[in-house]
Regions:
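Glycine/small-residue-rich loop that forms an oxyanion/phosphate-binding "nest" at active or ligand-binding sites
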Residues: 69-94
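Structured adenosyl-cofactor binding patch, chiefly the S-adenosyl-L-methionine
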Residues: 128-129, 143-155, 212-258
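RNA substrate-binding interface of SAM-dependent RNA methyltransferases
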Residues: 46, 100-183
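N-terminal amphipathic/basic-hydrophobic helices that include classical n-h-c signal peptides
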Residues: 1-8, 252-258
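Active-site/ligand-binding-proximal alpha/beta "capping" segment
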Residues: 179-229
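Amphipathic alpha-helical repeat scaffolds
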Residues: 37, 114-122, 230-236
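Active-site regions of enzymes building and remodeling cell-envelope glycoconjugates
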Residues: 64-75, 105, 176-177, 191-197, ...
Length: 258
């Protein structure tokens, strides 16, 4: 069936709305956020996100079936896009209402992660390893920041991101909590329960003392270099190593139990 096209030029108000949504204040007030790129837009649509408007070139339009589109030229699209090389589409989606937090399985928690690229990568990490719940302190970067959305490569559409007073949640949490530090137990010799929370801290300062005080244990990725001079790992890289180790051990255990 043909797509339902709308053919008209972009107005100043349309351009302004997309530009304003780069600011957290306007995203919070409107409940909207911007997604760029064909792949990501399609994934948000398939995940059931409500699209307020999709600006698409004619080369992209056939991929979206019955979605209501605003067909634009590549020149117009470049006015909307923040990318150096705009990718066929820019969409405005409505932020979903989050469900309650399910306290089971491996949960990743972020304590004041500031860099949008790191947050987007950690969201992709959760998606890759099947972690459905990502907890963020209220000081952590906004997951609907266009840079975070772009870095997540569509994975934000499949991961439940919850913002909350992290310490307050951990006080009442029924799961054991492990914080990643530079002076914890060796990650590779630690046995983790199937259900637990792993906390990653701020890029410069690590996990806050308030959150660290609530942990059941602290873990660290040991350095293997002879000189032992590397100061630290990027938080997204560290998160990948930790989650991969935990999931790998769990996979080995399930295979042994077969």
């Amino acid at each position: 069936m043909p797509c339902n096209y709308l053919f008209y030029m972009l107005s100043k108000n349309q351009l302004k709305l997309v530009q304003k949504l780069s600011q957290k204040k306007h995203r919070s007030e409107t409940g909207l956020f911007v997604v760029e790129g064909k792949k990501s837009i399609v994934e948000f649509v398939e995940a059931g996100y409500k699209a307020e408007v999709i600006y698409a070139t004619d080369t992209f339009s056939a991929s979206l079936g019955q979605q209501r589109l605003t067909l634009v030229s590549k020149e117009e699209l470049s006015k909307l896009s923040t990318l150096k090389h705009p990718d066929e589409g820019v969409a405005i989606f409505r932020q979903p209402k989050r469900k309650g937090i399910l306290q089971e399985g491996l949960i990743l928690a972020l304590d004041n992660i500031q860099d949008p690229g790191n947050l987007g990568t950690l969201i992709r990490l959760c998606d890759w390893f099947g972690i459905e719940t990502l907890l963020c302190s209220e000081q952590t970067a906004d997951c609907y920041n266009p840079k975070v959305v772009q870095a997540s490569m569509g994975s934000l559409s499949r991961v439940e991101v919850h913002y909350l007073p992290l310490a307050g949640f951990l006080v009442t949490c029924d799961l054991p909590v492990y914080v990643a530090t530079l002076a914890g137990e060796n990650l590779y010799t630690t046995t983790f329960p199937e259900d637990c929370v792993i906390v990653l801290g701020n890029e410069a300062n690590g996990v806050s003392p308030e959150v660290a005080a609530l942990a059941n244990g602290a873990i660290t990725i040991p350095r293997f270099g002879k000189r032992q001079q590397a100061e630290s790992l990027n938080v997204a890289m560290a998160g990948g190593i930790i989650v991969s180790q935990i999931k790998g051990k769990a996979s080995e255990g399930s295979q042994l139990g077969m």
